[in-house]
Amino acid sequence: MKPYVFTLWSLFFAIPMSAQDQADSTATNWERQLELKEVVVMASRTVVKQAPDRIIYLTKNDQYAKGMNGIEVLDRIPRVSVVNDMVTVAGKSSVKYIIDGHLMEISDEAMALRLKNLQASGIEKIEVLTTPPAKYGANNNVAYISITSKNESLGTRGNIWTNGIIRESFCYQLGGNVSHTTRKVELSADASWNDSKGINDLDRTYIFPYYTKISQRTTNYRNRTFGANGLFKYKFTNRLNAGVILNYYTNRLNSKLFDVTTDRGNVYSSTNYSPSRPDNALTITAFSDWMLDTKGKMLSLTYNYYDKQAQSFSDVTTSANNTDTKLTNTGDNKYHIHSAKLDAILPLKLFKMEAGLAFTCIGNNTALDVLYLENNSWMSDTKQSNAFEYDESTAVAYVSAERNFTNSFFGKLGLRYESTRTKGYQRVKDEESRYSYNHLFPTVNLSWNSHKAGRFTLSYSIGITRPNFNDLNPYKYYTTTSDYVSGNPDLRPSVAHNAEINYSFKGMYAVLYNSYNNDAIGYITRFNNYGSQYTIPENHINSNKTGLYLSYYRSFFGWWNINLGGEFFHTYAKSKLTDYKDADDSSWSGKIEFNTSFILNKQKNLILDMRFSHYFPYHERMIRYKAMSLLGCYLRYNLLNDRLTLTASVTDPFGWNTTKSTAIYNDYKVYTRNDIHASSVSFRISYNFGRDKVNNVYRDTKERESKRAN
């Protein structure tokens, strides 16, 4: 049977958010209305539907998603793109994930592995939230992707899988998950392992008025990661439950960098060896939910503790004119976050209201020791060795109200207040800095729907981007003895205004968006008088991006599906620094994407996917990027009543996935070419076991801040 041709919408702004209320897997009143009023029925199942504040993708209803893992499924959602296991949302600067209510605070690589640990057969729905309500943190321009497991009956189910990847070296991944639900207890656990090897080439050409400097750099690395998650939830009564969530992640990265730099006739050969050091993170969440009555009044109390400890070491050697210069960096980074949140849901007669309070306390202690070799003895560099302490506390209060004024018109208003205090202290230099700021963050969401004309949605919000801990850290991390990266403890948060108009009707989806950032953080590369160079973040950019994204989804003949998409946008940036040749920079650009799927046999268990994307040249924050194309092909074979899936894939067969850019400063130009060696062939086997219908194990940890520690 042909699948639904559906209507979609999406919103624009991205403030940090979790998935939905605990009982969100049960359709609310407006969801039931949408099923009747917003879906053009062409067959028996809806694949995508829209709500006033999110896109909802029903994975279980998409026959072309059969046998996919979590990261592959995301590429089937309008406005969402997947490149090299990295997920982006059109008009957004970053993406955060919630899996069964658990906000995932791990590295991008570990998150990709976590998504691969999920199978389409075990996913109930995926929601894309781009204008989260006031109850969630006001982080700027972040899209939230919420994945909810199936919610159908009691029992046990699980999945195991393994994946082999052939590049220059062989890599492998494996994982598994299991969940069990009774009338009183919900349990879930999963674990994943990744052992990857790769090559990263970075070539830079600096053109000065009277000479040219060329740097050719290759990094060979091996990265091993392990992640485990567990949840225990107990239902005391039908209205009261409590539980705990544990998340553990560890990473071991081993790398060796080779750099050859030619500068005014001199040739410098450098190596940077970084053996693996512990990088561990632990998150503990305790929660309780109390349903006060049968009308939906609820109180939720959540406590989060996050602890991360990361050690680093690098041995750097630069050789020139038969002379070696050696130094070592030894780093010890510790982060801890405590947060408590009280949320209330109050469905009143005229509108539904949400209100709450929250408090977060963050601590970051970092130590760096720099040694240099002199006369065959290692000496401490007291000018660069340091210890940095950073503390941050934020108090929050919010309120929001929403109402369906008619069957066609929906409105939602929210207001969030955040008061933040920060303190930074460099112990060696005995320097202390304090900073405080208070902000109000409004959100507005208006939506009108017509069965004949489609849905229109207008949204506006204000968000804030806080510096991450690495950017605040003032230490110098050397890649060669004359090239280092440093943080900046004087960085300040930047505020952004975001607006969006969405339209969807019968498989067509469009969004016109605008985002303005004031005093945003950008990275500047400068040269010292003696030829060394350094890169440092500074607040210096005002930027604006206006774009139009279009997509069209259609199925033909019951065995062929296409998803066409394109984006057209204008970017503008202005720097207040004098480093750049032109203080203003603007450009028009866009991208096109084409995804198609074929069912190749009558049993509908052999599926071929092909994906192509082309990015036109564009400018972003004073950097000019050249065009790039991406191509991938995937073949899936489902056996044993869809319990066993065999997948073969080819990614970037022609080596198109190479980033090229140009930055023009007052004193020089720099041309950069970065090749991550993305070409690969992979084979994956996955097996589902247990009952086909099992309750989801769902809980929002409401933890938002630990992403800044990554």
Descriptions of predicted regions:
Residues D21-N61, V82-N84, A90-S94, T130-P132:
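Short, acidic, small-residue-rich periplasmic hinge/interaction motif at the N-terminus
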Residues E38, G70-V73, A112-L113, E127-V128, ...:
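N-terminal periplasmic accessory domains that precede
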Residues G227-N251, P275-Q426, S447-T457, G507-L512, ...:
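Face-selective signature of the C-terminal outer-membrane beta-barrel domain
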